Amino acid sequence: MYTYGRKSGCRMSLDYTYKGMRIAYLENDAIRVGILLDKGADVFEYTFKPRDIDFLWQSPLEMRKPYVATNAMAEGAFHDYYYGGWQEVLPSAGWASEPYMGASQGLHGEASLLPYEASALEDTPDAVSLRTRVRLSRSPLSLERTMSLQRDKAALFIKEKLVNESAEEFAIIWGHHPAIGTPFLNENCIVQTPARKVEVAAFHPNGLWEPGGDYDFPMVPNRRSGKLQNITKVLPKATRSVDVVFFKELAEGWYAITDSKSRLGFGMAWDKSVFKYLWMWQVYGGHNDYPWYGRTYNVALEPFTSYPPAGIQNAIKNGTALLMKPSEVIETDLVAVAYEAASVTRVGRDGSIAVS
């Protein structure tokens, strides 16, 4: 990344475009973060510079500027533009045909499809900070996200402010959807998180795990073998499976996914009072129909307020939907870190890593 007058320390640029779409870069000596401002302020790159590894998954669909599809999918446009990376999901997750308060919310809501305003808050060798803002179209919500780097820290710090601008109570499913892929992801990877229970969604015919719960973390019945198996151990693409699972009753809000062989990993930490659940989307080559047709190998580890990914009405029914009061403001923070270690016992919201 070119930044005039500074070639080391923290750097930031809002001067770049890709295929006509605005992008921002944040960079320090440890990591480089790319942000697609014209689509959801997605994080499309998270590269750990000492290893030249971008943890985020690239899907078979390339990053494209908006285009006219042959016809509209009932679920909406999320998959048309899903190139991988890390999206913010709001005001709902998954897809359901029924509207909420008169509006169809579509697959994973609209926050990841809208263009965001962006401005620099701080730009010094010691710290850079970018503020993004959006007001949703079909929902009475506004979202402000501030992303920051500090000198010599392999950590992206995120502060968020979500506002219900309406005079009515408004229910949401809110979460972050970072997908992890090759060249980092492989069968030497394992996920660590302080959960007590696991629930498995009835998601796809090629699911590996027995749907239901609550299973004692991390052992879950493998429905092919009939035996209990550690669900946090990443499996090879030859497994030909796809599942969505929920890690519940978290003691703290954090996870780490570590390649124990290469001693490299990626983790997140967040406020558990807001994001109470950790979802894991496991695609081990088994999503053999639309939109992946057996081509994909990835996992996503997703802090969420609620579950399952089946539209807001289902989260209301199971009592996990986040009910925002009229004019309510929610402020919270998260961090995403890269590290070199064989095993992790904790990720802190200050970007710290405790290793074993």
Protein language model regions, located:
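Surface-exposed acidic/polar loop and edge beta-strand patches at domain peripheries
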Residues: 1-157, 168-171, 175-356
